[in-house]
């Protein structure tokens, strides 16, 4: 499912393509690209739920809390998000790339992935997808993109 999400994000979402509107055409294209139909439906459902997370009435855990609050991860979350991943999320909060709401959206979307192994690179992509889909987070999205691409280039000597 994550491969499909990556494909969709790189091919359609970042390019703001209109193909995302017609699920049937998109499903046909993804099937022709070699993806299995059940995984396609899971990925599309994942994206729909990401959009639905912006409705805070339906998701009470996305209500505003004080800036001094500390996130306590569940055992299930800690199994999927290792210590470096949780540290990266905390770092992004400290540099104001993520706020309480977007952090919870990221954790929610990570936990909905159908996977037992989740890498730091996977986490970065999920965070990019969340920030891209939240209105008003364009600056945070750009900031994270800069962090990711600067990290990949390495230090200059």
From Swiss-Prot:
Q: Which InterPro entries match?
A: Smg (IPR007456)
Name the protein family. Answer: Belongs to the Smg family.
Q: Which NCBIfam families match?
A: PRK03430.1
Question: What protein name applies here?
Answer: Protein Smg homolog
Q: Origin organism of this chain?
A: Colwellia psychrerythraea (strain 34H / ATCC BAA-681)
Phylogenetic placement of the source organism: Bacteria, Pseudomonadati, Pseudomonadota, Gammaproteobacteria, Alteromonadales
